From Swiss-Prot:
Stored Pfam families: DUF1292
Similarity comment text for this entry: Belongs to the UPF0473 family.
Name of protein: UPF0473 protein PEPE_1260
Database matches in NCBIfam families: PRK13678.1-2, PRK13678.1-4
HAMAP family: UPF0473
Length: 95
């Protein structure tokens, strides 16, 4: 990812839009899917935030693009995403 933060707008079931920053994306060979982790764009740097995770179908450049986000539904898939997130956060703490 380049220095410019990627942003994405999520629309809830009531039609409200909220802007999120892309924390990172990754692929899973085990599940054959790509994933994106997001956090609210108005969050402060030292603020604890709820991180959202979704599966997505990458575009031809293997980027997030304009595609639809797919909810993660299985416990096994959530466990894998949490493990990747914890590894990412652990690596960030070491920097």
């Amino acid at each position: 990812m380049d220095n410019e933060e990627q942003k994405i707008t999520l629309v809830d079931e009531h039609g409200n839009e909220e802007l999120y920053n892309v924390l990172f994306t990754f692929d899973s060979e085990d599940y054959g899917r790509s994933y994106v982790l997001l956090y609210p764009s108005e969050a402060e740097a030292d603020e604890e935030v709820d991180i959202q995770a979704y599966a997505f179908m990458p575009d031809e450049n293997h980027d997030l693009g304009e595609g639809e986000l797919i909810p993660i539904e299985s416990d096994e898939e959530w466990d894998m995403v949490e493990e990747v997130l914890n590894t990412f956060l652990g690596d960030q703490d070491q920097d």
